[in-house]
Amino acid sequence: MLSNTLRSNFLKFYANRHHTIVPSSPVFPHNDPSILFTNAGMNQFKDIFLNKETVSYSRATTSQKCIRAGGKHNDLDNVGHTSRHLTFFEMLGNFSFGDYFKEQAIAFAWEVSLSVFNLDPDRIYATVHEKDDEAFALWEKHLPSERIFRLTDKDNFWSMAETGPCGYCSELLFDRGEKFGTAASPLEDTEGERFLEYWNLVFMEFNRTAEGSLLALPNKHVDTGAGLERLVSILSGTNTVFEADVLRLLISKTEQLSGKTYHADEALGAAFRVIADHTRSLSFAIADGLLPGNTERGYVLRKILRRAVNYGKRLGFTQPFLADIVPSLVDTMGEAYPELRLSLSQIQEVMTMEEENYFKSLHRGGNLLQQVLKSSSSSSIISGEDAFKLKDTYGLPLDEIALLAKDYDFTVDMETFYQLEEEAKERSRKNIAKSHSSTDTVYDSLSLGENSEFVGYNDLSCDTFIEALVSNGKQVSSLKEKEKGALILKVTPFYAEKGGQIGDSGEIFCSDGTFIVSHTTSPKAGIVIHHGEVSQGQLSQDQAVTAQVNCIRRKKIGNNHTGCHLLHKALEVTLGDHIRQAGSYVDDTKIRLDFTHPKAIAPEDLASIELLVNEKIRENHRVETREAMYSDVMNSKEIKQFFGDKYSDVVRVVSAGFSHELCGGTHAEFTGDLGYFRILKEHAVATGIRRIEAVTGREAEALAHQDNENLNEIALVLQSPRDQILNKLQNVLEERKEQAKQISELENKLIHSLLDKLIDGCQQVDDVSYLIHHLPESESHRLQQYANCLHQKIPLRLISLWTTQKNGKYIIFSRISDDLVKQGLQAKDLLKIVLTPCGGRWGGKDIFAQGSADNLPQADALNNTLWQWISTQLI
């Protein structure tokens, strides 16, 4: 594959020039809530550019997985209908953090364009910012001035936000020839089809102030991004990015599955392109730990999948098909991105389950659309509210709603629909902004000398001093008795909540006062926040204090964290290599582990998992930790790591018997410290994600004791020895089963006797046979049972039965024949007429409906009402 060659050669080029090859970060940023998805190579280096993070290298190169399908950068609606829009793409990039700047960056880009990309130098153009004379002069070393163009801020100025690092940028474009347009220069090529941008070089040299001034940065940075798919298309000479390499292979697989042939210029061409792109986006997102859902990123994934299914219907797919395309993707990209290969079964299972659910939704939505058409027959207009509900709740695409409406000579109120859609988007934007605003805390503006030094792996108590105090969201100089707030220490033994492990609690004290630490967090890298309350005295900034962790609680937390690791490994050993952690939480009382698995775990497998963990506890392995370079362990098959996580250069490896994981948490000293392990329960939390909750130590012992007590009580109730409880229960159940059978036989006899009486009460006018009858104090579910039995015995067109319950409430049930439904009638229409005057409620389906009311008309009046409906509707 050309893409594999280009990617490899690009990274090698920069690696040979002292750049560190940094693995792609996940397609979603863990610690940057400002964006839904990773949409550029620089996302994972954002904190470096903002001077919030330091790394051991000053030059880096990456091939970054990107998704643009939500938020500000959203290409979703364009995908399939243009030559180059994609939701998933790869961004090749090189970065300089205070190292080289414009001259070297431009020289590198030119050399790569010729020697790695093998582009014709006579067809390369460059743009620079209109004020960037330096970049213009540097490009003149490689290009004639007539192929260098000056553009405004709109095109050639980059900024991360309204304030902060920013700078001029320079774009490289390739002239694809007159086949793609008659524009003579990039300035005339408004569509960008002929002069195709393939690389953008950003020069971060300014800091924009709140007043809008541009101040020179002390350290200048370089951030570049080259679109791999565009380069492949250019070098392959194809009209679109879809007709070469990986995407063309996925289209070919779709051709094979659908039995249809891809033609780029035909209407079905868009369907092939959408399916190829969306399959790739979904696969990478699921491999990185995302799942379709109803909020934020999960909602976007679900939208992508449903869009692919909708286009698949145009190709004739009526059942799940996306999973069958994924192996072709893994075969071509699995070597560069091993997470695809490791997650293949998970990707396929999630896709298939989502598709199955969506096809069911579409079926329900189609039925609802038919109801909407009936209810709107007087106006011949589907309201915007109904159309929006069908799309938003049931996933029925707007174009399908419009097509069906057209078939019935209906129109859709598009203006209201789009208004409601925009209101929903605005609510979503506000919710996202609200959820993100919590991260903009006072801690971002604190002036601290250095980051907090954590010594808590080895010491649970230390002497330190207070660097800062916070109360009610503001930095303060002191905290007095009974005041709640937070402390930041120069050195701390307190572990801050992260990685699924709850933070420590304890005390911070000196001769002047004591601060009770309730919990500990880390809102930004290197800062540990101790939350709590002054129990006595007063504490002030720069004061010398002693920090003491609650040792007993810490030990319990560490034991549970080690138990979580053992459980994770036991799951993999018992169920298979597809097991991947999808989330975890450990505190001093319990373990919670979420993991990828398509179905409920069999009881015998749960027992095996529990036994295996306890076996490792009894073996009493020393829990060992060591530091290692991430580059040395990143490809290890033995050491568990999570593709959704971002790791620093130096990582911590925790080994506990057969378990080896990258982990920054605290742990037991020996596996035997856990004492005993018990699983509380196992259940689903999302499509393809299961959860196990478990306990260790005294909590596990208490659970075993409670189980023992429960067995004793059951034995007492059953009047049976404990070792014979199961047999006794089976005998009791068999007896109940036999009794239920006898009761059922008696009920059937009574029903048949009653049916004979009901049949005698049937009436017929012309060709309409019907029954209206009152059954005193019958159970409500019996009404439907009687109606169904009657329907099987004689061809009644309408049955209406009602009963009075002991509490005085009336229940009424109606059933109509299939031929009446085909005429457009519904059983609930009848109940509506009967129950509306007396404030009743009703619901049901076309054929049968049930309602209730506190009062009903007298029997004669009720019969008259029902008869009037029959005479007007049926006779």
Swiss-Prot record:
GO MF annotation terms: alanine-tRNA ligase activity; aminoacyl-tRNA deacylase activity; ATP binding; tRNA binding; zinc ion binding
Localization per Swiss-Prot or TrEMBL: Cytoplasm
Cofactor binding comment, as recorded: Binds 1 zinc ion per subunit.
Cofactor annotation: Zn(2+)
Record keywords, A-Z: Aminoacyl-tRNA synthetase, ATP-binding, Cytoplasm, Ligase, Metal-binding, Nucleotide-binding, Protein biosynthesis, RNA-binding, tRNA-binding, Zinc
Alphabetical list of SUPFAM superfamilies matching this protein: Class II aaRS and biotin synthetases, Putative anticodon-binding domain of alanyl-tRNA synthetase (AlaRS), ThrRS/AlaRS common domain, Translation proteins
EC number, as in UniProt: 6.1.1.7
UniProt binding sites for Zn(2+): H561, H565, C663, H667
Pfam families: DHHA1 (PF02272), tRNA-synt_2c (PF01411), tRNA_SAD (PF07973)
Reaction it catalyzes: tRNA(Ala) + L-alanine + ATP = L-alanyl-tRNA(Ala) + AMP + diphosphate
Superkingdom of the source species: Bacteria
GO terms for biological process, alphabetical: alanyl-tRNA aminoacylation
GO cellular component, as recorded: cytosol
Annotated family: Belongs to the class-II aminoacyl-tRNA synthetase family.
Role according to the record: Catalyzes the attachment of alanine to tRNA(Ala) in a two-step reaction: alanine is first activated by ATP to form Ala-AMP and then transferred to the acceptor end of tRNA(Ala). Also edits incorrectly charged Ser-tRNA(Ala) and Gly-tRNA(Ala) via its editing domain.
Listed PANTHER family: ALANINE--TRNA LIGASE, CYTOPLASMIC, ALANYL-TRNA SYNTHETASE
NCBIfam families per UniProt: alaS
Domain statement: Consists of three domains; the N-terminal catalytic domain, the editing domain and the C-terminal C-Ala domain. The editing domain removes incorrectly charged amino acids, while the C-Ala domain, along with tRNA(Ala), serves as a bridge to cooperatively bring together the editing and aminoacylation centers thus stimulating deacylation of misacylated tRNAs.
Protein name, entry field: Alanine--tRNA ligase
Naturally occurring in which organism (per UniProt): Chlamydia caviae (strain ATCC VR-813 / DSM 19441 / 03DC25 / GPIC) (Chlamydophila caviae)
Organism taxonomic ancestry: Bacteria, Pseudomonadati, Chlamydiota, Chlamydiia, Chlamydiales
